[in-house]
Amino acid sequence: MFPATVQFWDTSLEPKQAVELALRRSARMQCERGHPKGRMVTLGVMSTPSPEFSALSAPLTRSRAHTRAGIRACVDRAIANGSLAAGLDAAALTCVFDSFMLGLSTLARDGKTFKAMDAAITQLMHLWDMHAR
């Protein structure tokens, strides 16, 4: 399991807090000195583009699916506990946060700072608030 995403499964955290914490930890890790720029789970798919290499990319695919499932679990928990609206499109909101998280690695690779990513995460979390009850 990717260390920055373990909080998705921590039910002692509020769902929004878990998602926000995962995003901020991932962004911070991407920008740490000595850490390769860009997340292997995201960018590793670029080195295995054809079907004959699918066995090589399978662990990366599973890791991304696990992260996506964690985000979805948080969204579903928030709907169940009433902190997000019941009619919310949970799949779409999950896709938004998953896409953003995957994009952090590209931003890091392109030299964006943690400060810039952190500010973007703050803006993204307003989307969660827009759907709060």
Model-derived segments and their meaning:
Residues 37-43, 86-107, 120-127:
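Hydrophobic alpha-helical segments that form the core
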Residues 5-38, 90-97:
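Hydrophobic alpha-helical connector segments
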Residues 2, 6, 20, 27, ...:
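Structural signal for well-ordered, non-membrane alpha-helices
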Residues 29-33, 77, 97-115, 127-133:
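Amphipathic C-terminal alpha-helical segment
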Residues 15, 37, 56, 86-90, ...:
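Residue-level recognition of alpha-helical structural elements
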Residues 17, 21, 36-37, 53-80, ...:
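Amphipathic alpha-helical packing segments from all-alpha helical-bundle domains
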Residues 33-55:
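Amphipathic alpha-helical segments used for helix-helix packing
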